């Protein structure tokens, strides 16, 4: 792709992006509606979560394919509208879950598809930080983002886990969210102090997800949590034949000749490709050649619905049951 148009509410930022990434004659806009009048093939939606659906739908309605940053949308209703428009217009809609393209994720996904883990009945999806609250942009603004670490990082962890299990049939969701440290300052945050008055999202969130086949997922996410390690990202899968743990590398637990064995695949051979580059190549071929997407919008829709259910459960104190 050649990037020939940029849009930002602040013209200076759009101009800087043009100078960094654009063609010499790229145009700059402050209103996405004007940009969509251009003869474009693709639009990248990298805006606050509250506008993902609005901009993506307008782009597809005007004949453009869309690459939308995660999370898909702020709400399930918005995400569902995006999928419906993609189906109606026939435009490609890709959601930015680039973690799927990591070497360890690709290896483990193949093992899951080959049945090496058997029936996966328990999983843990972890994306936690002790003190790494993003203090820039609108990350702390619930109206613009829809939430905090759950919708920011937990969305990656949940997407990875559902994809590995190849199970999107959710029965129920129970969740808890906390805002226990948001009113504190001088806490050693990685990116400096935040303004407690502007911290309107949760600082940690947890979910218990039960699938229709009985499988269970535990989801944990945080920006600020008094844990021992500084951060952690983990996908733990437990199956009837084997188990796997993606945390600081990949380990697979198997039984060989009656003995428990831990396998650590060598994923360092050759030059591993950047997951972002793989994502762009797959998106390009989906647009240019009609190739199949790895991240299906229908899958991202389920992720969005589960995240929304965690917030709803946390607010009502009740388990949320899916149809």
Protein language model regions, located:
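N-terminal Rossmann-like dinucleotide-binding module
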Residues: 1-22
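Active-site loop of classical SDR/Rossmann-like NAD(P)-dependent oxidoreductases
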Residues: 12, 246, 270-281
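C-terminal helix-rich "cap/oligomerization" subdomain common to oxidoreductases
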Residues: 20, 42-44, 80, 88, ...
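Conserved SAM-binding strand-loop segment of SAM-dependent methyltransferases
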Residues: 25-32
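Hydrophobic residues in well-ordered beta-strands that form the structural core
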Residues: 30, 68, 93-95, 219, ...
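Beta-strand-loop-alpha-helix segment that lines the small-molecule cofactor/substrate pocket
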Residues: 40-42, 48-49, 53-100, 115
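Predominantly a Rossmann-like dinucleotide-binding segment in NAD(P)-dependent oxidoreductases
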Residues: 99-199, 317
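Contiguous beta-strand/loop segments that form the cofactor/metal-binding neighborhood of enzyme cores
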Residues: 159-251, 280-292
């Amino acid at each position: 792709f050649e990037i020939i148009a940029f849009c930002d509410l602040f013209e200076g930022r759009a101009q800087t992006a043009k100078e960094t990434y654009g063609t010499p004659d790229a145009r700059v806009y402050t209103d996405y509606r004007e940009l969509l009048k251009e003869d474009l093939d693709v639009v990248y939606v990298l805006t606050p979560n509250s506008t993902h659906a609005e901009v993506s739908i307008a782009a597809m309605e005007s004949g453009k394919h869309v690459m939308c940053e995660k999370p898909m949308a702020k709400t399930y209703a918005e995400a569902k509208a995006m999928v419906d428009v993609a189906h109606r217009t026939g435009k490609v809609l890709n959601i930015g879950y680039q973690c799927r393209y990591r070497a360890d994720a690709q290896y483990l996904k193949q093992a899951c598809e080959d049945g090496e883990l058997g029936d996966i009945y328990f999983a843990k999806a972890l994306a936690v930080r002790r003190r790494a609250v993003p203090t820039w942009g609108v990350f702390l603004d619930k109206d613009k983002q829809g939430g905090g670490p759950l919708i920011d990082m937990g969305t990656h962890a949940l997407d990875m886990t559902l994809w590995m299990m190849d199970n999107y049939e959710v029965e129920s969701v129970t969740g808890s969210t906390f805002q226990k440290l948001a009113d504190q300052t001088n806490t050693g945050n990685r990116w400096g102090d935040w303004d407690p008055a502007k911290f309107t999202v949760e600082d940690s969130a947890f979910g218990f997800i039960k699938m229709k086949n009985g499988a269970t997922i535990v989801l944990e996410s945080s920006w600020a949590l008094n844990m021992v390690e500084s951060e952690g990202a983990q996908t733990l899968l437990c199956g009837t034949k084997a188990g796997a743990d993606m945390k600081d590398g990949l380990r697979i637990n198997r039984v060989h000749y009656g003995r428990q064995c831990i396998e650590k695949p060598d994923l360092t051979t050759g030059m591993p490709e950047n997951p972002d580059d793989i994502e762009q190549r797959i998106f390009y071929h989906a647009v240019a050649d009609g190739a199949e997407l790895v991240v299906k919008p229908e899958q991202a829709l389920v992720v969005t619905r589960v995240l929304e259910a965690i917030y709803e459960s946390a607010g009502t104190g009740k388990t949320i049951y899916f149809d």
